[in-house]
């Protein structure tokens, strides 16, 4: 009975909600097995598991796999792999990893790891603050698959919800900062500062950039090609007219609020741009930078309802004067109209972005932080202007009380005017203060010169203030200090720095302050957007696979969410163990020797990897090597990243089969052999084939002194099958938001850690606050992200995916991704030309349909097919990339045969509609493709004058049913109008009026 009771207790604890479980002990001991290939033990045969994650993650059932294998003309998955992947690079052994763990057990194990993190009260500041995450937003947005599994809103007809929310974000940023135009977020504040520096350089072509030494240390960055100088404002000399821009922090990292008007005036007189890093909450009561002439404003919106997350993910904001809008990096939502003249939303000015401008893009960044920007936007919508001002005043008042108490206790405050941060020279022993802080489990900022910093936030209450006063030896309570302050202590509110301008006056920020209304508003927006909860999203090179509930569950655990990124490492041992586990597994999967988790996106990983190559070559005395070879079919981020890393780009041609043109490559290598730095290649190629000569390409580059950068965007076709580090690559980034299941979030977050071979390991990113390089020979390249380990809080997603799949499951996922793609290609090849195949006639995990001939035969283009697919309930494949006028399809391993067949049926049906146009049965101008997508308003309108039926428009195949159909909410977008009439803030209320309101106003 005792034994039964003990087992029942374990089972009950495993099934209980995490916060109700008993204190965690050590993780359950497991047998270490490589690849899971041995016969099952007797106990496993008697107690079969029903919660094996692999069969939940992989879509096709065994019968469906057999049917698909038969359709593509092979007997087994292994035969398909042999015919798809070059034999010279195949991995012929199992991955050396622990056997898979079932879902419930892995969450128990992960919670044991998370419990090693110590949740202290952190008042370290430096751009990271505790905040209260409104539960309606956490429950209905952050933890909602309808929001987190959306793709970037490049198809606006099925993305109006998140586009509206991101427009709210932009409007909020513009209003609070006093600027003209904002983008839809960047990766973090440090990245935003680097982007501001690049913007200044692009604007006036000057090479020098001043940085106020009182910026946050992680914000001070040095990018190749721009000379940065740390100076105080009075030391900055602009008379040489060689300074592109100046960056200052307001309030600064020590908390001081300072008037920068004179500095800005001096800068502008000499053609220098002024950039301000700031705090949105402070600006709710503080004069905004836009009112004293700043050109660029940036910062983090983390404290608007996003947890600390050990550094990320968080959305940075970026706003500029109107004259700089076309220089601005990142995505930007704008207002335009649809085919019916309705005011709608879209991504504006995309010609600035890397997928079009390539090496001349305004930024190499492809991923933003859409999910976190949406959380911050909803925080602003939920609280409104009055609510935000109340929160800001509360934080400021708490800081005033603390300041008064510290003065009474004999401590010196370094600044008289502040918002939420105090810098203190202790009147007693610093060690004594820190010892008392440890007793209360409180973290403060420790300066190298012995001063201490305390930054308060919206979560601080009276007890917190009492504890902080106690650790500094103050005998008075917060209540007694407050009573003695009197009305004359108003801080910012009694100075010229007090904000007098209104903000967030738009109705959207004044309508949803009850939980009922905010929940309904979020649901209304969610219902406008297609996501993985509706149907497959077959975007080539984007890997829109399952983001499982078990993987996503840990991101909101307080043990991961409530850790400041700059706490001592002994308070983050859970995170450190997770990083080590994940690094070990990723090194085994890729064949690399070392991983850096700092890059927040694939593009940032590209920059970090190329910068490591450049640092390595410089250390060898080969600084002259700067030429980077890039195939013309490469991701647009590749040339943009190479340009940012200070390299010169040499394009390489692609042959008719979609592979690198070897003869042209050899010619370019020979031409640039003295200056060759690297080649950037994607494998399998962006054309969807495993190139046979990949090993020879790597050998050729190495022979001539270069390094091989392998873009990891297509890693989903390689896991367990081949390893980049084995066939010659020196460095790769890994898109954890593709291959390793971090959701796309409607355009971010992402993670792009880089893996390197041993010789590049000393040149991985470091950090100015937390030491992360352990290599004794380290010569780090600097910092590429604000936080030491990037977006730490989403790494548990990839960790859970790898642990629950195990070596065997990971390999099988890649196999089924390839099988699914080949099955779809086989079904569609009779109706569309498959543009590229491997040497034995098979594709990799994605393939390209050539739709270019339809332009001549029926005046139909790829965009028409993309929009028509929305009527069938599908998001479009990748459009016009890597070949203009084509569609690239990637099904992933998570979709079952039924969903693949539905998509293929839709594409075949659309091909028949094109044939109807070609053969004169359908009008060449007014047809289901040209008029798509068809909205519910359109189909139910009393007026229908089109030469095809409503059924053809809205229900073209039997599986498209009224009760389950996803409806596009707007007609086709007018992109040209949107760029010609750029509006990037919420439109006036007249745009939201009903016809009844218009009639009423007209009659009056």
Swiss-Prot record:
CDD domains: GDC-P. Liver (at protein level). It catalyses: N(6)-[(R)-lipoyl]-L-lysyl-[glycine-cleavage complex H protein] + glycine + H(+) = N(6)-[(R)-S(8)-aminomethyldihydrolipoyl]-L-lysyl-[glycine-cleavage complex H protein] + CO2. Stimulated by lipoic acid. Inhibited in presence of methylamine. Its cofactor is pyridoxal 5'-phosphate. It is an enzyme of class 1 (oxidoreductase). One of its GO terms (biological process) is glycine decarboxylation via glycine cleavage system. The modification N6-(pyridoxal phosphate)lysine is found at residue 738. The keyword Transit peptide applies. One of its GO terms (cellular component) is mitochondrion. It is found in: Mitochondrion. It comes from the Eukaryota. InterPro entries: ArAA_b-elim_lyase/Thr_aldolase, GcvP, GDC-P_C, GDC-P_N, GDC_P, PyrdxlP-dep_Trfase, PyrdxlP-dep_Trfase_major, PyrdxlP-dep_Trfase_small. GO terms for molecular function: glycine binding; glycine dehydrogenase (decarboxylating) activity; glycine dehydrogenase activity; lyase activity; protein homodimerization activity; pyridoxal binding; pyridoxal phosphate binding. Transmembrane segments: none annotated. Keywords: Mitochondrion, Oxidoreductase, Pyridoxal phosphate, Transit peptide. Pfam families: Beta_elim_lyase, GcvP2_C, GDC-P. Its EC number is 1.4.4.2. Homodimer. Interacts with GCSH. The glycine cleavage system is composed of four proteins: P (GLDC), T (GCST), L (DLD) and H (GCSH). The glycine cleavage system catalyzes the degradation of glycine. The P protein (GLDC) binds the alpha-amino group of glycine through its pyridoxal phosphate cofactor; CO(2) is released and the remaining methylamine moiety is then transferred to the lipoamide cofactor of the H protein (GCSH). HAMAP family: GcvP. Belongs to the GcvP family. This is Glycine dehydrogenase (decarboxylating), mitochondrial. It comes from Gallus gallus.
């Amino acid at each position: 009975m005792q034994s039964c009771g003990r087992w029942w207790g374990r089972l009950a604890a495993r099934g209980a909600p995490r916060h109700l479980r008993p204190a965690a002990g050590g993780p359950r001991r497991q047998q270490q097995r490589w690849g899971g290939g041995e016969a099952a033990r007797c106990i496993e045969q008697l107690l079969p598991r029903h919660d094996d994650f692999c069969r939940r993650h992989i879509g096709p059932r065994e019968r469906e796999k057999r049917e698909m294998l038969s359709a593509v003309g092979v007997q087994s998955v292994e035969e398909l792999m042999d015919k798809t992947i070059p034999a010279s690079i195949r991995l012929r052994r199992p991955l050396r990893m622990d056997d898979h763990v079932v879902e419930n057990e892995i969450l128990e194990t992960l919670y044991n790891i998370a419990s090693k993190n110590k949740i202290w009260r952190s008042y370290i500041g430096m751009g990271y603050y505790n905040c209260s995450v409104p539960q309606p937003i956490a429950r209905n947005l952050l933890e909602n698959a309808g929001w987190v599994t959306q793709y970037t809103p490049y198809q606006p007809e099925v993305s109006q919800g998140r586009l509206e929310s991101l427009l709210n974000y932009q409007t909020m940023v513009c209003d609070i900062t006093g600027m003209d135009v904002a983008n839809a977020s960047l990766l973090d504040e440090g990245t935003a500062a680097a982007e501001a520096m690049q913007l200044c350089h692009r604007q006036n072509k000057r090479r020098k950039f001043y940085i106020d030494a009182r910026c946050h240390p992680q914000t001070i960055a040095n990018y190749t090609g721009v000379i940065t100088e740390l100076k105080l404002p009075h030391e900055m000399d602009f008379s040489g007219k060689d300074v592109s821009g100046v960056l200052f922090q307001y309030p600064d990292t020590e908390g001081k609020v300072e008037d920068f008007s004179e500095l800005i005036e001096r800068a502008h007189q000499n053609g220098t741009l002024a950039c301000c890093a700031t705090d949105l909450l402070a600006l709710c009561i503080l004069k905004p930078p836009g009112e004293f002439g700043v050109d660029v404003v940036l910062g983090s919106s983390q404290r608007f309802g996003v947890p600390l997350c050990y550094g990320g993910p968080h959305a940075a904001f970026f706003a500029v004067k109107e004259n700089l809008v076309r220089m601005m990096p990142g995505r930007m939502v704008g207002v335009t109209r649809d085919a019916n003249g309705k005011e709608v939303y879209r991504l504006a000015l995309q010609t600035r972005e890397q997928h079009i401008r390539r090496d001349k893009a305004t930024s190499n960044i492809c991923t933003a932080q859409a999910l976190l920007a949406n959380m911050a936007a909803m925080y602003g919508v939920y609280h409104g202007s009055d609510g935000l001002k109340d929160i800001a005043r509360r934080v400021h008042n708490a800081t005033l009380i603390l300041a008064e108490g510290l003065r009474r206790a004999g401590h010196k405050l370094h600044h008289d005017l502040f918002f939420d941060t105090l810098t203190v020279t202790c009147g007693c022993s610093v060690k004594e203060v820190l010892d008392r802080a440890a007793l209360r489990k409180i973290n403060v900022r420790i300066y190298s010169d012995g001063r201490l910093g305390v930054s308060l936030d919206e979560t601080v209450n009276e007890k917190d203030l009492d504890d902080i006063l106690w650790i500094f030896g103050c005998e008075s309570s917060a209540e007694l200090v407050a009573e003695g302050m009197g009305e004359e202590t108003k801080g910012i509110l009694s100075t010229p720095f007090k904000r007098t301008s209104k903000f967030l006056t738009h109705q959207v920020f004044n309508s949803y302050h009850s939980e009922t209304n905010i929940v309904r508003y979020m649901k209304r927006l969610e219902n406008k957007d297609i996501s993985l909860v509706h149907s497959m999203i077959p975007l080539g090179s984007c890997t829109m696979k399952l983001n499982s509930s078990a993987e996503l569950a840990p991101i909101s655990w307080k043990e991961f969410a409530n850790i400041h990124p700059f706490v001592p490492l002994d308070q983050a041992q859970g995170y450190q163990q997770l990083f080590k586990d994940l690094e070990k597994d990723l090194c085994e999967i890729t064949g690399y020797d070392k991983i850096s988790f700092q890059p927040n996106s694939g593009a940032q990983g590209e920059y970090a990897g190329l910068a490591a190559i450049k640092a390595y070559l410089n250390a060898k005395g080969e600084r002259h090597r700067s030429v980077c070879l890039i195939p013309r079919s490469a991701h647009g981020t590749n040339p943009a990243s190479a340009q940012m890393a200070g390299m010169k780009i040499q394009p390489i041609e692609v042959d008719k089969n979609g592979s690198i043109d070897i003869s042209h490559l050899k010619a370019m290598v020979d031409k640039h052999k003295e200056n060759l730095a690297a080649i950037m290649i994607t494998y399998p190629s962006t054309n969807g084939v495993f190139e046979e000569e990949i090993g020879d390409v790597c050998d050729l580059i190495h022979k001539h002194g270069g390094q091989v950068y392998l873009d990891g965007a297509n890693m989903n076709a390689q896991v367990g099958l081949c390893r980049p580090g084995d066939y010659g690559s020196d460095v790769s980034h890994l898109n954890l938001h593709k291959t390793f299941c971090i959701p796309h979030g409607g355009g971010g977050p992402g993670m792009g850690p880089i893996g390197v071979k041993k010789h590049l390991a000393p040149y991985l990113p470091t950090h100015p606050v937390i030491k992360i390089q352990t290599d004794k020979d380290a010569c780090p390249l600097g910092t590429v992200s604000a936080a030491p380990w990037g977006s730490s809080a989403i790494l548990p997603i990839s960790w859970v995916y790898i642990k629950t799949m195990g070596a065997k499951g990971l390999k099988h996922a890649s196999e089924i991704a390839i099988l699914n793609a080949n099955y779809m290609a086989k079904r569609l090849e009779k109706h569309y030309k498959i543009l590229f195949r491997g040497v034995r006639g098979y594709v990799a995990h994605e393939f390209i349909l050539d739709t270019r001939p339809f332009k001549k035969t029926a005046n139909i283009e790829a965009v028409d097919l993309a929009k028509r697919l929305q009527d069938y309930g599908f998001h479009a494949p990748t459009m016009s990339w890597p070949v203009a006028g084509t569609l690239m399809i990637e099904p992933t391993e998570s979709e079952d045969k039924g969903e693949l067949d539905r998509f293929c049926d839709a594409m075949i049906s659309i091909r028949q509609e094109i044939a109807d146009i070609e053969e004169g049965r359908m009008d060449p101008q007014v047809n289901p493709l040209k008029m798509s997508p068809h909205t519910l308003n359109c189909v139910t309108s009393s007026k229908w004058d089109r030469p095809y039926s409503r059924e053809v428009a809205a229900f073209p195949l039997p599986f498209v049913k009224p009760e389950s159909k996803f409806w596009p909410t707007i007609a086709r977008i007018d992109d040209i109008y949107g760029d010609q009439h750029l509006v990037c803030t919420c439109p006036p209320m007249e745009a939201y009026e009903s016809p009844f309101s218009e009639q009423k106003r007209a009659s009056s």
